[in-house]
Curated annotation (Swiss-Prot):
It comes from the Bacteria. Its main location: cytoplasm. Residues 1-180 are annotated as: Large ATPase domain (RuvB-L). Has 3 domains, the large (RuvB-L) and small ATPase (RuvB-S) domains and the C-terminal head (RuvB-H) domain. The head domain binds DNA, while the ATPase domains jointly bind ATP, ADP or are empty depending on the state of the subunit in the translocation cycle. During a single DNA translocation step the structure of each domain remains the same, but their relative positions change. The RuvA-RuvB-RuvC complex processes Holliday junction (HJ) DNA during genetic recombination and DNA repair, while the RuvA-RuvB complex plays an important role in the rescue of blocked DNA replication forks via replication fork reversal (RFR). RuvA specifically binds to HJ cruciform DNA, conferring on it an open structure. The RuvB hexamer acts as an ATP-dependent pump, pulling dsDNA into and through the RuvAB complex. RuvB forms 2 homohexamers on either side of HJ DNA bound by 1 or 2 RuvA tetramers; 4 subunits per hexamer contact DNA at a time. Its EC number is 3.6.4.-. The gene is ruvB. DNA binds at R290, R309, R314. GO terms for biological process: DNA recombination; DNA repair. HAMAP family: DNA_HJ_migration_RuvB. It holds the Pfam family AAA_lid_4. This is Holliday junction branch migration complex subunit RuvB.
Length: 325
């Protein structure tokens, strides 16, 4: 199982509230996306209209939820949040939509996991800002059209390919979030340290950033765990030595890989001479769900050039073999 410290899907309540940036100017990284979004938001405010429906996609932990909250804050409108798996019935979505006010933001996380019947309700809501509701049953049932105030739907997904084309095409704005650079993560760690009232030197911040898999959520989680080691050993401010020790104790190597990553790489290296090998074979051998491997393990390994996805299966690179040895 993936080390929860490196699981970008796991977020603490503290991170959700205290450590999130509240405005675009506070948001570190994703500069091209941020620049475009500033233009879109400013234009919508000048026109006194809702922002076009927006689809945010990219690996977990990169700031999709934060962006949704920032959009609502910048627009000075209400934000309603839910998630694809929660909306099991069309009535669930209809109840949310009918309570929206003009220009409000509805954020649906994991939108690729929407029930197809719920998704179909969204089509007219997104295009025409209306709902067709069936009242009654049997021969006496009739359809009633309910008109909605203009709103902005923000969908977030880690699996863009799983979103149906009809739904995808209804988003006027598509924004991709990429992994962060070490420099950007260092700034995020330093900002997080100030918010948490943690003293640390630059080398400690860089060490945490280097091991954070390009992901702010992981960087902030590691910062808090290093803080714990510093308190236990009475080290203040946090320095590179205690940071290195803490992260080693947590099973996180210099590149941010944990035992699950090493197990994945070694399986391919030792059993298939570096690959190719099919994803289902890997999942069975590691006793992991295919989705877990594709969402939590592979993206970063591909990003750092350790794994290649080919038509014949997964292949690990010479750099990966060098790192293992």
């Amino acid at each position: 199982m993936k080390n929860q410290l490196l699981d970008a899907k796991v977020a603490s309540e503290e991170q959700e509230t205290v450590l999130r940036p509240s405005l675009l100017n506070d948001f570190i990284g994703q500069n091209q996306m941020k620049s475009n979004l500033t233009i879109f938001i400013t234009s919508s405010i000048e026109r006194d209209e809702s922002l076009d429906h927006t689809l945010l996609h990219g690996p977990p932990g990169l700031g999709k939820t934060s962006i949704a909250q920032i959009i609502a804050k910048e627009k000075n409108v209400n934000l309603k949040s839910t998630a694809g798996p929660i909306l099991s019935k069309a009535a669930d979505l209809a109840a949310i939509l009918t309570n929206l006010q003009k220009n409000d933001v509805l954020f649906i996380d994991e939108i690729h996991r929407l029930n197809i019947h719920v998704e179909e309700i969204l089509y007219s809501a997104m295009e025409d800002f209306s709902l067709d509701i069936m009242i009654g049953e049997g021969p006496s049932a009739r359809s009633v059209k309910i008109y909605l105030p203009k709103f902005t739907l923000i969908g977030a997904t880690t699996r863009l390919g799983l979103i149906s084309k009809p739904l995808c095409d209804r988003f006027g704005i598509h924004l991709k979030l990429n992994f962060y650079s070490c420099e950007e993560l260092t700034q995020i760690v330093e900002r997080g340290a100030k918010v948490l009232n943690v003293a640390l030197d630059t080398n400690a911040a860089i060490e945490i950033a280097n091991r954070s898999r390009g992901t702010p959520r992981i960087a902030l989680r590691l910062l808090k765990r290093v803080r714990d080691f510093g308190i236990y050993q009475n080290i203040n401010p946090l320095n590179q030595q205690i940071t290195d020790y803490a992260l080693n104790q947590l099973g996180i190597d210099k590149l941010g890989l944990d035992s699950s990553d090493h197990k994945y790489l070694r399986f391919i290296a030792e059993n298939y001479d570096g690959g190719p090998v099919g994803i289902d074979t890997i999942a069975a051998a590691l006793s992991e769900q295919r989705d877990t491997i594709e969402e939590m393990i592979e993206p970063y390994l591909i990003q750092i050039g350790f794994v290649q996805r080919t038509q014949r299966g997964r292949v690990i690179t010479a750099n990966a073999l060098k790192h293992l040895h």
